[in-house]
A protein has these predicted regions:
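Beta-lactamase-like hydrolase cores
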Residues: 2-21, 106-109, 121-122
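A short, well-structured edge-of-sheet supersecondary motif
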Residues: 9-37, 136, 178
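Structural recognition of the beta-strand scaffold that forms the well-ordered cores
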Residues: 18-19, 28-30, 72-75, 107, ...
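Conserved catalytic neighborhood of penicillin-recognizing serine enzymes
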Residues: 23, 68-129, 170, 174
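Active-site SXXK
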Residues: 24-25, 48-76, 108, 164-168
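A short, polar/charged loop-to-alpha-helix boundary motif
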Residues: 37-47
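Extracytoplasmic/secreted proteins, especially bacterial periplasmic and envelope-associated proteins
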Residues: 50, 58, 62, 69, ...
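Active-site-proximal helix/loop microenvironment
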Residues: 135-178
Length: 178
């Protein structure tokens, strides 16, 4: 140290990154934010956020295990849910505010069609789908017991998402990160 000053700019927004070896579970890269020393908070392992559409493949995987195929047709059309007890109406939409009608599951997944994901979850049942998705290593208590689960409204850490996704990359086997 020469007694000089050092400057650093603390970013206003922070992020996290997790990279796992899907075959072994080895953590290849982990970034939990700008500075753990400043915040004592690791966003990669502690920050629970909604994964959004990156969660849909888990719902589709459950559908494939429940008799659907990549070629199965599912209706991408408007749907309305009425909660009589709360006197609320839910009209889910696709991000484009368009509907494509009957669409093959493979196309619906790569186009991230919300209504198809919701219909798949509805047809399989929320509780049985949660039981299936928990096999990827997710805590059932973090998975909402309603149809919004199909849109990725669970609260999960980046580590949990990366761990779940690793099963897709290694033939369906769950790993434990280390």
């Amino acid at each position: 140290d020469d007694g000089g000053l050092a400057f650093s700019q603390v970013p206003g927004a922070q992020s996290a990154l997790v990279t796992l070896d899907p075959n072994t579970g080895a953590i290849r890269a982990l970034v939990g934010g700008f500075s753990f020393e400043q915040s004592n908070y690791n966003r990669a392992t502690q920050a629970k956020r909604q994964p959004g559409s990156s969660f849909k493949p888990f719902v589709y995987s459950a559908a494939l295990d429940n008799g659907y195929t990549a070629a199965s047709l599912v209706n991408d059309a408007p749907i309305v849910f009425v909660d009589e007890y709360l006197d609320k109406v839910w009209r889910p939409k696709n991000d484009t505010n368009t509907f494509l009608g009957p669409i093959r599951m493979r196309e619906a997944l790569y186009k991230s069609r919300n209504l198809v994901s919701i219909r798949l979850l509805q047809s399989m049942g929320v509780d049985s789908t949660i039981d299936y998705i928990a096999k990827f290593g997710f805590n059932k208590q973090d998975l909402p017991r309603n149809l919004s689960l199909a849109l990725g409204t669970a609260t999960l850490t980046p580590m949990e998402i990366a761990t779940g996704w690793s099963a897709f990359a290694n033939g369906g086997y769950k790993i434990n990160p280390y």
